[in-house]
Amino acid sequence: ELKEMIEGLEQFDFICGYEINLSCPNVKHKTIMPFLNKNYIKEIVKNARKLTKKFFSMKLPPYTGIEYAPLCEEYGADAVTLNNTYPGVVYYEDKKFISGGISGPVIKPMMLYNIFQTAKLIKIPIIASGGIQNYKDVEEALNTGAKAVQIGSINFIYPDAIKRILNKEL
């Protein structure tokens, strides 16, 4: 799947890089999660590097990102993204459970911890992801060791969040 995707996208000059998500908790069939297997991560990173000369970052799970970031660096990733959402479950009164990813400001302290610890272990850039809501959050992530940030959940509240953050309006 990765090979098909990268080969299909390589033809477009306007694509300057990729983020390879190794930990999305929002998938239907969760029989095996690849982030639990170091060999799988090693093979994905090595294969991605063989397929492209473009920049690529490995988006790592929050609970093993510190451990696997050096492996991503060793096998050719240009950066790591920390972190993805945390898996969670919501219970409804009709006794239905819905699982998915927990994101937003609640995960920011854990994301900052992971960046702080990982920055001691690797030289490649860390992209912060998780709970960035305003300019202060961006500063915290950068001061903790990130070189860039991703903006996600806040876009549901403010579709122009990036502009507002850049202008220090958030």
Please identify what each model-predicted range represents:
Residues 2, 41, 45, 65, ...:
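Aromatic/hydrophobic pocket-lining residues that form the small-molecule binding cavity
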Residues 15-19, 55-59, 78-81, 125-127, ...:
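Structural preference for beta-strand elements that scaffold enzyme active sites
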Residues 33-37, 58-61, 103-107, 127-131, ...:
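Glycine- and other small-residue-rich loops at beta-strand/loop junctions that grip anionic moieties
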Residues 1-33:
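Active-site beta->alpha loop and helix N-cap motifs at the rims of alpha/beta catalytic domains
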Residues 2-8, 63-75, 117-123, 128, ...:
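Catalytic cores of alpha/beta
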Residues 25-36, 68-120, 124, 160-164:
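Glycine/Thr-rich beta-alpha phosphate-binding loop at enzyme active sites
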Residues 22-24, 79-90, 131-132, 137-165:
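Glycine-rich phosphate-binding active-site loops on the catalytic face of alpha/beta enzymes
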Residues 10, 45-53, 73, 115-121, ...:
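Surface-exposed amphipathic alpha-helices with a cationic face
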